[in-house]
């Protein structure tokens, strides 16, 4: 999956209903958490019906150097909401060496994935 293909895939699936609000604080960790929360607005209506192949293709984007940070954030959000060993494995692997600007964001995604997958 290409970065452009990912966004077309995402745009074609609609959006899950939600209300979000957060503000910038100046604290990098708190602001990253706010960005993570706002990122949930990207979840498609059928976010829990992604195939293992789709998860793998999206996950590959995390490990490509030239993929934009916003794309990686969207992938992290989608993977975080999957009840899937594949998604959990990808997030665990990415958290071993995340892109520097995504360290906290990636950790939040992994923690959310652990929750969805029944691991405290």
Task: Please give the residue ranges for each predicted region.
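Long, acidic/serine-threonine-rich intrinsically disordered regions with weak helical/coil propensity
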Residues: 1-40
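Positively charged, hydrophobic/aromatic-enriched amphipathic segments
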Residues: 9-14, 112-120
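Structural detector for internal amphipathic alpha-helices that build alpha-solenoid repeat scaffolds
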Residues: 31-49, 71-83, 93, 104-116
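Short N-terminal edge-element motif at the start of the domain
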Residues: 56-70, 76-77
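Positions within the helices of HEAT/ARM-like alpha-solenoid repeats
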Residues: 67-72, 87, 101-102
């Amino acid at each position: 999956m290409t970065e452009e293909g990912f966004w077309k895939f995402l745009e074609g699936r609609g959006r899950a209903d939600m209300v979000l609000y957060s503000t910038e604080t100046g604290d990098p960790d708190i602001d990253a958490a706010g960005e993570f929360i706002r990122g949930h607005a990207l979840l498609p209506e059928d976010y829990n019906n992604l195939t293992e192949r789709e998860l793998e293709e999206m996950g590959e984007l995390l490990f490509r150097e030239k993929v934009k940070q916003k794309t990686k954030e969207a992938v992290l959000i989608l993977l975080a909401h999957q009840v899937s060993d594949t998604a959990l494995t990808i997030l665990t692997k990415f958290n071993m060496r995340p892109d520097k600007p995504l360290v906290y964001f990636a950790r939040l995604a992994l923690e959310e994935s652990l929750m969805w997958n029944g691991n405290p």
